Amino acid sequence: MSYGKKLTNAELIAFLNANRHGILAFAGRTPYALPMGYIYREKTLLLCLTDEGKKMERLKKNKTVCYTICKTRWETEGLKTPCTSAVIEGKLEAVKDKSVYGLGAKKFENMTLYKLAIAEMGARKCIRKPCELFANKSGATVKARGKKKG
């Protein structure tokens, strides 16, 4: 049984524009992933990375990455919006001309702007109503933590 429905292209673009963070995972002998903000412009994901650390060591060896964006029911009022996610695979490439993306000549100290050259992308949303995966024994859906009405 499938729990997800593929997003239309319009839904995918709206999802990418509505969110600003995800998890960037690097290829390698051992797993390495970190939370990372992004900007979606001109059918491209843009990421700004510091020029040092483990991610740069990984990137020098292999530019292939996977970026996952997820919005869960827990993040919405009354658990009403379906869980939605996008998984994007490709290679990170340094952006030489930032003006192409309307970013001007901004320069961040010890940081480089990268674009994710998308090789493959998939996006789905949950079709369960309400989310049966988080229902308690009585069948009632568990309320979102930290959310107060009114």
Describe the predicted segments one by one.
Residues 1-18, 134-135, 141:
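Extreme N-terminal tail/first-helix region
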Residues 9, 22, 83-84:
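Hydrophobic small-molecule pocket/channel-lining residues, especially in calycin-type beta-barrels
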Residues 14-16, 37-39, 57-59:
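Short, conserved, surface-exposed binding loops centered on an aromatic residue
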Residues 19-51, 67:
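Short beta-strand segments
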Residues 22, 45, 92-93, 121-123:
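Short beta-strand segments in beta-sandwich/barrel cores
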Residues 37-41, 91-94, 130:
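A short, sequence-level motif marking secondary-structure junctions
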Residues 52-111, 118:
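Short, structured beta-strand-loop surface elements
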Residues 98-150:
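C-terminal edge-of-domain segments
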